[in-house]
From Swiss-Prot:
Reactions listed under catalytic activity: uridine(38/39/40) in tRNA = pseudouridine(38/39/40) in tRNA
Any Gene Ontology biological process: tRNA pseudouridine synthesis
Name recorded for this polypeptide: tRNA pseudouridine synthase A
Catalytic center residues: D52 (nucleophile)
Role description: Formation of pseudouridine at positions 38, 39 and 40 in the anticodon stem and loop of transfer RNAs.
GO molecular function list: RNA binding; tRNA pseudouridine(38-40) synthase activity
Gene responsible for this protein: truA
Organism lineage: Bacteria, Bacillati, Bacillota, Clostridia, Eubacteriales
UniProt subunit comment: Homodimer.
Species this protein is from: Clostridium kluyveri (strain ATCC 8527 / DSM 555 / NBRC 12016 / NCIMB 10680 / K1)
């Protein structure tokens, strides 16, 4: 039995997230269907994250076990011939049987892209959040520092989150503006349900002048979800990389 590690990318627009569901189409389902067609066996796929509906990925990691005699070097090619055009395998390799794509992670990197201007984009609109109002980027940048480090992020998780602990460590949070495109990058040891989207939504409130820079610190310390901003739409979010 071989343990195969995959790195995949996907456009999450038409999917109800990563995790298999009974009444919806998901990335995990499509990948497991392709593996079953290729190997003749059903192999549950273990994902490194549970991305939400509409979220994209450029470097999602997963693994599955198989007794198939397909050479490991050919798995990438075979699966790509069977997967829909909005999912692709970037790399495949055999790893130690102990490897678990979720439990072995040491961190993840996400990006979030916003487009400003007098009209929403047409090309690529499914990958960005159009935001018409003017933002103070310097205030947003200055607010980012409050998120860096180890904190209780209870104020930045969706109600109903089943995480045992709300303590997470953010190693990097940057914002870059080029013309009418604003891109956030965030690196951390792990993220709570909707955490990245709520953080970005809170930073937009700072950029609009509704929240002061210092208020961000207060939100963190309050651990109160009601005090933070609304989550931004899923379509601007992309899982860039998973660290091991």
């Amino acid at each position: 039995m071989k343990n195969i590690k995959l790195v995949i990318e996907y456009d999450g627009t038409n999917y109800s997230g990563w995790q298999r569901q009974y009444n919806a189409i998901t990335i995990q389902q499509r990948l497991e269907e392709a593996i079953e067609k290729a190997t003749g066996e059903f192999s549950p796929v273990i994902g490194s994250s549970r991305t939400d509906a509409g979220v994209h990925a450029r470097g999602f990691v997963c693994n599955f076990f198989t007794a198939s005699k397909i050479p490991t070097s050919n798995i990438k090619m075979v699966l790509n011939t069977l997967l829909p055009e909005d999912i692709a395998v970037l790399d495949s390799k055999e790893v130690d049987s102990s490897f678990h794509s979720r439990y072995f992670t040491t961190g993840k990197e996400y990006s979030y892209t916003i487009v400003t201007g007098d009209r929403p984009p047409v090309i690529g609109r499914q990958y960005v959040y159009y935001f018409r109002r003017k933002l103070d980027i310097e205030k947003i940048k200055n607010s980012c520092e409050y998120f860096i480090g180890t904190h209780d992020f209870s104020a930045f998780k969706k109600k109903g989150s089943t995480a045992r602990s709300s303590i997470r460590t953010i190693k990097e949070l940057t914002v870059l503006k080029e013309k009418n495109i604003i891109k956030f990058n965030i690196v951390g040891d792990g993220f709570l349900y909707n955490m990245v989207r709520i953080i970005i939504g809170t930073l937009l409130e700072v950029g609009l002048g509704r929240f002061s820079i210092e208020y961000v610190k207060y939100i963190l310390e309050s651990k109160d979800r009601a005090k933070a901003g609304k989550p931004v739409p899923a379509k601007g979010l992309c899982l860039e990389k998973v660290f091991y």
